């Protein structure tokens, strides 16, 4: 078995506790996290995390296709908005 | 004259036959060709544009009536504007153009004015509104029906439910950011 398989995905220990707490509360709260290096796990789907980018917390609503990625991927530290005038935003 | 949007700007010339390099502000850079004819900021000059290629993120195009490099160089820095109604009109339900959302007044559910939409961004986890709060500060809100229950483009406003952060015991340890 490859080393990366038996070690499992990396996750900062406190993340699971935070997610469980938020889910148990039943409120639609944003969970502030600083751990950009943690892997997104299936049990995070549906929760909204505020991922710190060194300046502010970017809201990240976790969906199924984000599993396996790191939180930091969705919270860029260098912001460039671009100028796309005809780009469409879909309200989910 | 109705509202207009800037779809590009001429940033340089290409070759000796009057072609120009354009920084396109459309989602797909080459799509700028579909908005021809365009006009300059004052609205006095019309440009008929034909896209001939792309290089280093810029669009190469020829302009009708511009046939030599000197004439093309004189246009450097010129913005290319089109009327707002020329942008895609058929949008699905709950679909909005970035350019329509930017600048909208942001109100709370109780009608209190919070600020204005500074920018819209998609970092891979859905669209996020960057709101400039009044008198200072900013707030990022996911563009979802829960967080943004009402969008009134015609009225120039949208209603936002500010995000509630879960209490965090480690916040002080992390610098209280």
UniProtKB/Swiss-Prot annotation, chain A:
GO BP terms, alphabetized: ribosomal small subunit assembly; translation
GO molecular function, one term: rRNA binding
Gene Ontology cellular-component annotations: cytoplasm; small ribosomal subunit
Database matches in Pfam families: Ribosomal_S19 (PF00203)
Keyword RNA-binding assigned: yes
InterPro entries: Ribosomal_uS19 (IPR002222), Ribosomal_uS19_bac-type (IPR005732), Ribosomal_uS19_CS (IPR020934), Ribosomal_uS19_SF (IPR023575)
Keywords assigned by UniProt, alphabetized: Ribonucleoprotein, Ribosomal protein, RNA-binding, rRNA-binding
NCBIfam families, alphabetized: rpsS_bact
UniProt family annotation: Belongs to the universal ribosomal protein uS19 family.
Function in brief: Protein S19 forms a complex with S13 that binds strongly to the 16S ribosomal RNA.
PANTHER family named among the record's database cross-references: RIBOSOMAL PROTEIN S19P FAMILY MEMBER, SMALL RIBOSOMAL SUBUNIT PROTEIN US19M
Protein's name in the database: Small ribosomal subunit protein uS19
Organism of provenance: Paramagnetospirillum magneticum (strain ATCC 700264 / AMB-1)
């Amino acid at each position: 078995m490859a080393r990366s398989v038996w070690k499992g995905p990396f996750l900062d220990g406190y993340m699971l506790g935070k997610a469980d707490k938020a889910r148990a509360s039943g409120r639609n709260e944003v969970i502030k996290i600083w751990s950009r290096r943690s892997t997104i796990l299936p049990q995070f789907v549906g929760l909204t995390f505020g991922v710190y980018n060194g300046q502010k917390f970017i809201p990240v609503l976790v969906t199924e296709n984000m599993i396996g990625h790191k939180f930091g991927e969705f919270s860029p530290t260098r912001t460039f908005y671009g100028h796309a005038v005809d780009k469409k935003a879909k309200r989910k | 004259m109705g509202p207009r949007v800037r779809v590009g700007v001429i940033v340089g010339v290409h070759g000796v036959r009057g072609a120009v390099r354009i920084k396109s502000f459309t989602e797909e850079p080459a799509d700028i060709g579909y908005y021809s004819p365009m006009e300059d900021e004052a609205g006095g000059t019309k440009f008929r544009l034909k896209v001939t290629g792309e290089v280093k993120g810029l669009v190469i195009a020829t302009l009708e009536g511009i046939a030599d490099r000197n004439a093309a160089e004189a246009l450097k820095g010129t913005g290319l504007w089109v009327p707002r109604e020329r942008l895609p009109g058929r949008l699905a339900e709950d679909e909005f153009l970035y350019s329509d959302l930017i600048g909208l007044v942001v109100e709370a559910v109780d009608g209190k004015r919070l600020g204005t939409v500074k920018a819209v961004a998609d970092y891979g986890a859905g669209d996020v509104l960057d709101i400039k709060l009044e008198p200072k500060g900013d707030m990022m809100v996911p563009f979802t029906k829960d967080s943004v229950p009402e969008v009134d483009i015609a009225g120039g406003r949208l209603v936002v439910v500010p995000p509630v952060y879960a209490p965090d015991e480690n916040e002080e340890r992390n610098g209280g950011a």
